[in-house]
């Protein structure tokens, strides 16, 4: 050993792990299994520091579990379908398949130098026919089980990508990929029946004790269970077949405040009216240009069209309410019709103000409050208010009490029925794109929609496609599209829609248990490896991916692909923070920001002396030039330094800011550990030392603290303990035996974080085999109890001294020692203490 050379060390130990197949996962009855999985990446072509942090966290857990005697499954794959590949093909003239597999190779080559404990033999991409062919088999099984169906639906249409978007893929009214304003269209779509599982998906959240409470709450709100009233308004001289307008409301207590009825532009009544009225037709067409998401609806200007129709109030048949077609009402929420209560709903308030409709309060903050409102009064349902127009329950009651009373009243008087509904809608999976999993059905003029035969799977994507024009190339590919009907053999056409890419990521965790099987899963492997013991990924996937995966696990269990024990696929979930970096910017003549690379800025100025504005802790973004390239860091400092820094600088659930000085400090520390090992290796093997027991006691405390830190995801806290123990070992005068034991234990404790350095130290000190497979050190409980304790002494709240005393002294003995300390005597300066407070094992407070 001469000096710390990460490039040489890391390559050597990665080769050793590879040749010894250390991370290859094989079923074993002799060890408890542990399945750790990070959310697999999209193959963009370059890894970023977020990848480094995410996969390093998973690697720490995987390596720790391997050392503690577990049979670890730690796989890697690629979430490879989706629009970016098609966009790249259109931009550079290539093919999505070539672009994707090229990126996968590049990212794999970038990822392997990190030294991750991945079983690469299980690797797959979702665009592999071997993978999506099994996904097609799952689809057919789901179809047979009634979990998939087809219907006409109002969808979010991206006019640039020319595809359907799920509500969650629309951001501020725009497509999440293209940025185009989203439109509403009615198309025939395939759906998963996730809504049938609403109650189970909701109630089972209580069993996910090792998930963040925030994620469970987000899913609970998304599923959106509500108790309300279903009733009808009678139309006055309405069109044939429309003598009633059905409404579902979660606030039946506000019925006496109703001033209008609103219906969706896609409500059957609105569609009937637009046939004969050009103005209605034009208004409805304009409404359909907006997206279907709640966000799009809420941010759009509230517009209505008075149909001229009137309905009777169910409590007062003499009262008539106007019927408006309104752009903020969606057909697939509730019944597609609402009653407007402007006094207690801000959206209705704005609408009523715009169209000069009555604003009628049904409850007030207090009995003497003013009824004239400048905005809607919307208290929490748990707040007690005065019902000035109540019809059920007490005058003073909470909203929850009033809602229950209103439902009881309406049921008793034949006005309506109490109903439980869910916000969760069925999952539309059809996408009008090429680069996705083909839906394995055929459309036959004689037989209708016919499932493809399983022996014909996979239905592979054709390679010879063109992206010269927008839309789905599969529609323009007759030799692929045209096929015999599987049922009758007559000419038919394949389904040209492909599956939403969230389907691909909703079961990949199960496929990893048997990635080369000729069925979606192998039950024996699924029973052994499932569930995922620890899942790691971003909070941005709290709703879509995680909820869909929970549904898929249930569907796979229903169709015989997973055991009952795996219907909740992720036992524990950890959502990590981002890696951030400063942004360096100046302003152009128009005041617009101009971004600069970090290497172009020195002491807050550019080379020409221009002062730079520094924005701290910003998300890394190529456009803002604050992206740190992991490959550059690895080349300069090594993978262990990158790993150490992203783990050490912040709690893992919080963002960590990347700084060059932090990386340099991490590298210097690892160099110190290296140098320390070299010094210990050169010690006289027979020389006696001082403080052996003290060093070994500190070592066992470190073992305990690091173990607890790793098990609780407190990686930064564990590393802080490693820093402290390293400093103690550097100063130690103990003999060779104690110092060798300490440095080898330090290598073991650092191994999950800095595996290459740990292997080299272990080998240099003569350790058996690989440190990666060495048993995790155990703390001796007896060594964790110290004979002495160090107590700070405060005088009137200010720290004045420290005393080292026996741990078993009485309070009176501690008082005597504290008052006899020279520093305390000087600080008292002859004053007599009024009170002495001894907190055992913690502190001595002297009050004068």
From Swiss-Prot:
Keywords: Aminoacyl-tRNA synthetase, ATP-binding, Cytoplasm, Ligase, Nucleotide-binding, Protein biosynthesis. Its EC number is 6.1.1.4. It catalyses: tRNA(Leu) + L-leucine + ATP = L-leucyl-tRNA(Leu) + AMP + diphosphate. One of its GO terms (cellular component) is cytosol. A motif ('KMSKS' region) lies at residues 619-623. The keyword Heme does not apply. A motif ('HIGH' region) lies at residues 41-51. GO terms for biological process: leucyl-tRNA aminoacylation. GO terms for molecular function: aminoacyl-tRNA deacylase activity; ATP binding; leucine-tRNA ligase activity. It comes from the Bacteria. ATP binds at residue 622. It is found in: Cytoplasm. InterPro entries: aa-tRNA-synth_I_CS (IPR001412), aa-tRNA-synth_Ia (IPR002300), Leu-tRNA-ligase (IPR002302), Leu_tRNA-synth_edit (IPR025709), M/V/L/I-tRNA-synth_anticd-bd (IPR013155), Methionyl/Leucyl_tRNA_Synth (IPR015413), Rossmann-like_a/b/a_fold (IPR014729), tRNAsynth_Ia_anticodon-bd (IPR009080). Belongs to the class-I aminoacyl-tRNA synthetase family. NCBIfam families: leuS_bact. This is Leucine--tRNA ligase. It comes from Roseobacter denitrificans (strain ATCC 33942 / OCh 114).
């Amino acid at each position: 050993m001469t000096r710390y050379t990460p490039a040489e060390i890391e390559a050597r130990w990665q080769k050793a792990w590879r040749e010894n197949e250390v991370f290859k996962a094989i079923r074993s009855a002799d060890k408890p299994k542990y399945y750790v999985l990070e959310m697999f990446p999209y193959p963009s072509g370059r890894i970023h520091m977020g990848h480094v942090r995410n996969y390093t966290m998973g690697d720490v857990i995987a390596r720790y579990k391997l050392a503690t005697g577990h049979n670890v499954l730690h796989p890697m794959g690629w979430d490879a379908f989706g629009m970016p590949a098609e966009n790249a093909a259109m931009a550079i003239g290539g093919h999505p398949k070539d672009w994707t597999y090229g990126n996968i190779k590049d990212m794999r080559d970038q990822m392997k130098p990190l030294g991750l404990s991945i079983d690469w033999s299980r690797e797959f991409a979702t665009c592999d026919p071997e993978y999506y062919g099994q996904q097609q088999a799952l689809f057919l099984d789901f179809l047979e089980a009634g979990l998939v169906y087809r219907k006409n639906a109002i969808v979010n249409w991206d006019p640039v990508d020319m595809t359907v978007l799920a509500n969650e893929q629309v951001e501020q009214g725009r497509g999440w990929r293209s940025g185009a304003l989203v439109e509403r269209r009615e198309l025939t779509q395939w759906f998963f029946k996730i809504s049938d599982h609403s109650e189970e998906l909701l109630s089972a959240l209580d069993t996910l004790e090792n998930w963040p409470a925030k994620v469970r709450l987000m899913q609970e709100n998304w599923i959106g269970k509500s108790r309300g009233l279903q009733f009808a308004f009678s139309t006055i001289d309405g069109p044939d077949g429309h003598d009633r307008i059905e409404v579902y409301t979660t606030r039946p207590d506000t019925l006496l405040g109703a001033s209008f009825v609103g219906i969706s532009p896609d409500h059957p009544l609105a569609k009937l009216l637009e046939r004969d009225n050009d103005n209605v037709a034009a208004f409805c067409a304009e409404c359909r240009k907006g997206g279907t998401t709640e966000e799009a609806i809420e941010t759009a200007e509230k517009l209505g069209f008075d149909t001229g129709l009137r309905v009777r109030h169910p409590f007062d048949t003499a009262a008539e309410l106007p019927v408006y077609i309104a752009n903020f009402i969606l057909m697939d929420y509730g019944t597609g019709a609402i009653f407007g209560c402007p006094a207690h709903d801000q959206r209705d308030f704005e609408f009523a103000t715009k169209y000069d409709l009555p604003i009628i309060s049904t409850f007030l903050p207090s009995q003497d409050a003013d009824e004239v409102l400048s905005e809607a009064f919307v208290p929490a349902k748990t707040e007690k208010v005065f019902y000035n127009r109540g019809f059920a329950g007490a005058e003073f009651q909470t909203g929850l009490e009033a809602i229950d009373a209103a439902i009881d009243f309406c049921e008793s008087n034949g006005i309506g029925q109490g109903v439980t509904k869910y916000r969760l809608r069925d999952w539309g999976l059809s996408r009008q794109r090429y680069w996705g999993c083909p839906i394995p059905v055929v459309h036959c003029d004689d037989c209708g929609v016919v499932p493809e035969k399983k022996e014909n799977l996979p239905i592979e994507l054709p390679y010879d496609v063109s992206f010269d024009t927008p839309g789905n190339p599969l529609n323009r590919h007759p030799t692929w599209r045209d096929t015999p009907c599987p049922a009758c053999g007559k000419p038919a056409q394949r389904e040209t829609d492909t599956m939403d890419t969230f389907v691909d990521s909703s079961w990949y965790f199960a496929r990893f248990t048997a990635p080369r099987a000729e069925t979606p899963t192998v039950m024996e492997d699924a029973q052994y490896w499932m569930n995922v013991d620890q899942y790691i990924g971003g909070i941005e996937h709290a709703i879509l991916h995680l909820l869909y995966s929970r549904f898929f696990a249930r569907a796979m269990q229903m169709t015989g692909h997973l055991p009952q024990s795996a219907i909740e696929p992720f036992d524990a979930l950890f959502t990590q923070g981002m890696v951030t970096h400063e942004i360096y910017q100046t302003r152009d003549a128009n005041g617009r920001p101009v971004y600069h690379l970090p290497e172009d800025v020195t002491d807050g100025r550019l080379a020409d002396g221009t002062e730079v504005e520094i924005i701290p802790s910003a998300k890394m973004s190529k456009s803002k030039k604050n992206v740190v390239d992991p490959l550059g860091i690895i080349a300069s400092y090594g993978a262990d330094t990158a790993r150490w820094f992203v783990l050490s600088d912040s709690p893992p659930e919080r963002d960590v800011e990347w700084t060059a000085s932090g990386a340099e400090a991490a590298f210097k520390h690892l160099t110190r550990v290296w140098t320390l090992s070299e010094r210990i290796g050169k010690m006289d093997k027979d020389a006696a030392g001082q403080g052996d027991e003290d060093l070994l006691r500190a070592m066992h405390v470190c073992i305990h603290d690091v173990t607890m830190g790793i098990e609780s995801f407190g990686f930064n806290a564990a590393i802080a303990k490693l820093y402290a123990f390293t400093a103690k070992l550097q100063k130690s005068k103990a003999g060779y035996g104690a110092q060798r034991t300490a440095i080898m234990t330090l290598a073991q404790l650092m191994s999950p974080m800095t595996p290459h350095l740990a292997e080299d130290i272990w080998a240099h000190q003569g350790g058996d085999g690989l440190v990666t497979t060495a048993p995790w050190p155990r703390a001796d409980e007896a060594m964790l109890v110290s004979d002495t304790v160090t107590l700070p002494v405060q005088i009137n709240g200010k720290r004045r001294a420290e005393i080292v005393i026996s741990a078993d002294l009485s309070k009176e003995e501690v008082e005597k020692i504290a008052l006899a300390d020279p520093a305390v005597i000087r600080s008292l300066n002859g004053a007599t203490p009024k009170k002495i407070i001894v907190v055992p094992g913690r502190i001595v407070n002297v009050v004068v």
